[in-house]
UniProtKB/Swiss-Prot annotation:
Belongs to the glycosyltransferase 28 family. MurG subfamily. One of its GO terms (cellular component) is plasma membrane. It comes from Histophilus somni (strain 129Pt). This is UDP-N-acetylglucosamine--N-acetylmuramyl-(pentapeptide) pyrophosphoryl-undecaprenol N-acetylglucosamine transferase. Keywords: Cell cycle, Cell division, Cell inner membrane, Cell membrane, Cell shape, Cell wall biogenesis/degradation, Glycosyltransferase, Membrane, Peptidoglycan synthesis, Transferase. SUPFAM superfamilies: UDP-Glycosyltransferase/glycogen phosphorylase.
Length: 357
């Protein structure tokens, strides 16, 4: 009987790195691969990965951007320690290949793999290249990207997303073009987005009889946001539902006629997978990462972009006034056409091919 192939997954820090990596890991588990994860104890992967039945090992590493002089002076020693820790784990686990999907942990892990002559596959989730992946790409066996032109010559494979996002009904089945009420989902991410929480009650006040809103406000914000809605409108259970978190975000996207949200790479690709239009409010960052992610759908007419410095209730209300169900269905179909349903499979195939060659 042939020996099971082994993959070491290196991803951490945020859901945008961790969830696509979990999708690939689970796909390969079904192909009888053995999976181990390299992460850090203080980030989300420490709790999330074991819940998905994947063993995890830890190294000590954190980000260096924006840190003080003392931290930067210590950086070479911190990185060297992390590389040695990763090398020890690799020597023990003996993977056939490692997959780097971003986050601080990928850097030391990728260097350690190269030192051990283990093939490295890199996947970049964002439209703007991350620092870790820009360095890892120089030593990688294969480089993959979610969006075109992040790397000059890498294969475009999309972002792996969970099967649940492709299992909802198609846009043509979901959109009721005779209903005047717009179902609006507002998502600020797990921490909420304060500016969206503040502005949406004002938007509803301008369109009191047109909107049905589900608003995910983030941890600890329900009471404050409920009060804001009460100040602006005669709040009813039918018009607004306010919640800290949404357990089944795929079904929530499928329920909505339009989503108002940030534009992290995973969010953009999940909305494309479901086929739901969006108003993106990109998080302001010097490299415009979220803005460029959002353009993937906005450039084909599947979404609108409102930059944060231009954001006000009147602008959002005007966008919602100007769309009818026929227009939203057209946008939804354009979003669906930009989805990459074979992304998880393709990343897994590249990993398997790397071992064969």
């Amino acid at each position: 009987m042939s020996k099971r192939k082994k993959l070491l997954v290196m991803a951490g820090g945020t859901g945008g790195h961790v969830f696509p990596a979990i999708a690939v890991a689970q796909y390969l588990q079904k192909q009888d691969w053995d999976i181990c994860w390299l992460g850090t104890r203080d980030r989300m992967e420490a709790k999330l990965v074991p819940k998905h039945g994947i063993p995890i090992e830890f190294i000590q590493i954190s980000g260096l951007r924006g840190k003080g002089l003392i931290t930067l002076l210590k950086a070479p020693f911190v990185i060297l320690r992390a590389v040695l820790q990763a090398r020890k784990i690799i020597k023990k686990y003996q993977p056939d290949v490692v997959l780097g999907m971003g986050g601080y942990v990928s850097g030391p892990g990728g260097v350690a793999a190269k030192l051990c002559n283990i093939p490295v596959v890199v996947h970049e989730q964002n439209a703007v290249l991350g620092l870790t992946n820009s360095l890892l790409a120089k030593i990688a066996t294969r480089v993959l990207q979610a969006f075109p032109n992040t790397f000059p010559n890498a294969e475009v494979v999309g972002n792996p997303v969970r099967e649940a996002f492709f299992s909802v009904p198609m846009p043509q089945e979901r959109f009721n073009t005779t209903c005047e009420t717009l179902k609006v989902l507002v998502v600020g991410g797990s921490q909420g987005a304060h500016i969206l929480n503040t502005i949406l009650p004002e938007v509803l006040a301008q369109l009191p009889n047109r909107l049905e809103i589900v608003h995910q406000v983030g941890s600890g914000s329900v009471e404050n946001v409920t009060a804001l809605y009460h100040d602006k409108v005669n709040l009813t259970q039918e018009s607004v539902q306010i919640t800290e978190f949404i357990d089944d975000i795929a079904q929530a996207y499928a329920w909505a006629d339009i989503v108002i949200c940030r534009s992290g790479a995973l969010t953009v690709c999940e909305l494309a997978a479901v086929g739901t239009p969006a108003i993106f409010v990109p998080f302001q960052h010097k490299d415009k990462q979220q803005y460029l992610n959002a353009k993937y759908l906005a450039d084909v007419g599947a979404a609108y972009i409102v930059e944060q410095h231009e954001l006000d209730a009147e602008k959002i209300a005007q966008l919602l006034k100007n769309v009818d169900k026929e227009k939203l269905l057209e946008m939804a179909e354009k979003a669906k056409n930009m989805s990459t349903p074979l992304s998880t499979q393709r990343v897994a195939e590249v990993i398997m091919d790397t071992v064969k060659t």
